[in-house]
Each structure stands twice: as C-alpha cells, then as structure tokens.
C-alpha cells in the first residue's frame, strides 16, 4: 500500500459548509475501509490535510474525483502527492 497526502485550500465562501456533512460521512466510510488514515482542517481554517493509504495513485485520484466536496464552492485541491513516511505511529501504520 502507498500513502498519499491530499492538501486542500479553503476560501471564505460559506457555500463550502453545505457539502461538509456528506463529505465527512464519506471520510468515515473510507476510514472504516482502512483507506483514510487521518483528515482534518488546519487550525487557521485556510485548508485541510488528508492522508490516504491505497494501492495506486489512480485509486487516490478516484477517491478525490468521487467526492463532490473537492470540486465544490470554496474548496481547491492544492496537491495530491505520494508520501514516504520515515517514521509512523503504530495506529497510523
């Protein structure tokens, strides 16, 4: 399995919050499937970071493409990059 870091940027558009409940339900399902290791907004609310563990980059891209939140108002995908952790807490591994 390979890890991918998804970085998001948020604008001040209040419409962003409308898609968040469905997005968080999807995140919970991905977590339960073992594909999402961690997710959450930055403290300054400028964006968010999500860590996925999947077999291929195509699978990570499909996860992003299948969630309307990522293409909705007020949300921009900054990057989706393969991540190579040097050390990792057991609960994330």
Regions found by a protein language model. Give the residues of each.
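Conserved, structured core segments of small domains
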Residues: 1-93
């Amino acid at each position: 399995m390979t890890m991918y870091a998804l970085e998001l940027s948020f604008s001040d558009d209040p419409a962003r919050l409308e898609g968040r409940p469905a997005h968080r339900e999807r995140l919970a399902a991905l977590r339960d499937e073992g594909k999402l290791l961690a997710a959450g907004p930055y403290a300054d609310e400028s964006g968010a970071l999500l860590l996925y563990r999947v077999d291929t980059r195509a699978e990570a891209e499909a996860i992003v493409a299948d969630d309307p939140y990522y293409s909705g108002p007020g949300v921009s995908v900054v990057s989706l990059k393969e991540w190579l952790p040097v050390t990792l807490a057991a609960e994330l591994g």
